[in-house]
């Protein structure tokens, strides 16, 4: 991943500058170029978009539940079957793939970002500290919202004896990241 290599190169250049070495501006610019075109902003916009979509999905789930219970006496019905199909088709298959890509990219980039940020700690401004805090809270809060939403979907379908992916994986349970994994 070119962004990780760029962050590592930039970290090394910061160390060199702190040690008093002279660097060519063009070398620093070359290190920044992959970041300018790369993943960093896309990751943050991905987490923000996911957070907004999850909040919207929570709102729809609230509205869906307020109208009437999905099932009575844990008995499935056509409405519950349609809901389970929707959850399985949209969330457990397509949306979950996108979430996994976002999570993997974040896990690749953030260690290099952390290394770079630690190397800049002595010259860190309050604005940068606030940005880092806000960024980390966005990611952490969105992860927590995802786990909560998946649990709610499971609980809602559980009132009918169903779960997302139930027909494919009868013992699927949500994992710590909010994805359903077969057991």
What do these predicted regions represent?
Residues 1-54:
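Acidic/His-rich structured neighborhood in mature extracellular/periplasmic domains
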Residues 38-183:
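A cross-kingdom marker for long, charged
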């Amino acid at each position: 991943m070119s962004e990780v290599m760029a962050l590592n190169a930039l970290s090394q250049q910061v160390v060199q500058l702190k040690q008093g070495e002279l660097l060519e501006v063009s070398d620093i610019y070359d290190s920044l170029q992959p970041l300018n075109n790369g993943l960093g902003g896309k990751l943050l916009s991905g987490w923000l978009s996911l957070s907004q979509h999850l909040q919207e999905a929570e709102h729809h789930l609230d509205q869906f539940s307020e109208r009437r219970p999905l099932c009575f006496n844990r008995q499935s019905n056509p409405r519950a079957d349609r809901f389970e199909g929707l959850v399985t088709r949209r969330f457990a298959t397509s949306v979950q793939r996108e979430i996994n890509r976002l999570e993997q990219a974040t896990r690749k980039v953030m260690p290099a970002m952390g290394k770079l940020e630690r190397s800049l700690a002595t010259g860190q401004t309050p604005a940068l500290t606030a940005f880092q805090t806000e960024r980390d809270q966005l990611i952490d809060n969105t992860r927590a919202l995802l786990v909560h939403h998946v649990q709610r979907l499971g609980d809602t379908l559980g009132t009918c004896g169903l779960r997302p992916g139930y027909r494919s994986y009868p013992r699927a349970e949500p994992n710590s990241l909010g994805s359903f994994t077969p057991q």
